[in-house]
Amino acid sequence: MSRHGPQSATSAQALGAGSALVRPHEMVDEIGHAGSKSALARLNEAMAEIKALSMAPLLQRAIDAIRADDHKTATEWALKALEQDDQSGFAWYTLGIAREKAGDFASSISAYESALRLLPDHAEVANDLGRLAFRMGMLEQAEKLFLHFLARHPGHVEAVNNLTCAVRAQQRYDEAIEILRPVLLRQPDSAMLWNTMASIVAEQGDYATAKLFFQEAVQLDPGFFKARYNLGNCLLMLGETQAALDACDEALKGVRAEDERQMMHMARSTMLAGLGRLGEAWDEYECRLHPRFAEITYFVMKGPRWAPGMDVKGKTLMVIGEQGLGDEILFANPLGELIEDLGPDGRLVIAVEKRLVDLFQRGFPQATVCSHITGAIGVRPARTVPEEVDISDVDLWTPMASLLRAYRRSVEDFPANPTGVAADPARVEVWRQRLAALPGRKVGILWKSNITKDARHRYFAGFDAWAPVLSQPGVTFVNLQYGDCAEELARAKAQFGVDIWQPPGVDLKQDLDEVAALCCAVDLVVGFSNATFNIAASAGAPSWLITIPGSWPRLGLSDRYAWYPQVRVFGLDRFGDWGPVMGRVADAVGAFAAEVAAEA
């Protein structure tokens, strides 16, 4: 980009904002498109006002290029117009549309802001800027921009829908429903509004009702492919995995925007995994590396990237961890076999989050383990290794999850005794001695994720659902939950009469070596899949997993967990109905405690 508008607080924040609001299994919003027919029509009307200016033909060519989806050419003509008059709001607006459609959000948001400053009465600019802010996860700014547009266009259906999406994404569900309800009552034939209402209901965990609303949207508009995709995600959460995949495949037939297509490919990969079609799933999962995938992480590495089928014997191969802590541990499942394939003359270099380095080094002593670092390219995260790490002899490199394409193409490919991370034996013994002073079986528990910004809470039982588990006699419960859990610990004491033992002197989020040792020292770990659960299970601790329908890491299995063979699975029968499964967990914990009592 050769020109940039003045940077405001909004554009400055964009440079550090998350890329996208929507994740796989999350619902996608219909908030309209920059450069829509109505927006381009208004631009054409504006051309009449500036037709006497020399830039008019340049802008017309830019608009024609946008219509033809030629965003590069549109950008070039808009920049030529700005070279003649950099105070033309319409030229900045045209540039903003072109850059947004090209996926260059940082430049786009700057251009839109310049347009809004120069065209304060052209409310369509505020609407487009709001949509872009929404796509980048800048929800408060998006809400204000949609309100600005509605002040000029009260009752505008699309703008009301957009505002609802912004409010809902901030988890203000009741407020979102109240904004949307009167408009939906006036226009009950609007598929867009039914899709948004369904998304609100789904985020609150009522997938059965959401399914009906998404079906209504699809029935009203069979060509509304985003609603069809959302229906697929809803079906997945209800355990209807094949129907979910069918809906996703239908949606892909009609979606043109590349970022939306890649998002759907990501969801499709997890649906395939949930059906046990692992080879297809991992091949599809490569979409996470597509440049138009909204949550891409760039890997900044020199040399060729490894691909399935390459002969690695005698090579030096670098594997880079990706996504969250739990993912880095989960996706490490094939590393043991990779080391065998490299042979005695080969070398494996593993780059992981710095808190995991010692755990990986103990688990894979033949490898060289270092930390990775994450910066940014534009608004996208970029991962590499520190300069002090010598990788001059690396022959090949790969993101860690890509190894699944070669080593885990079926459930049968998962070994009975996989190599994983390893706790410090000396620290395990220290914790065992401390725990020996406590009565009964020692059961570590995990009940939530620390991530709340994307409504992930609905994947975890509320703390009250743990009451039957915590009431089991003959057990000392040990807190393994990282993050702020003081309220839950106090409630356990006040409401259930249970003192959950808090490990002294340990930061359960940062001191992962101690966490691993503690997990291996207790008799059992029980909880949901988060970073700590993956550490415990990978290190070989006896572990019980509570999981929801549609959870792709189950790989279509109901009675076992292929990643960690010792894990016992307790699956939800129906999304949101935590009572039965927590009852089964409680009975199992009681039986587990009774075994020791009987032996004594």
Can you annotate each of these PLM segments?
Residues 1-524, 532-533, 537-600:
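Alpha-helical solenoid repeat scaffolds of the TPR/TPR-like class and their adjacent stem/linker regions
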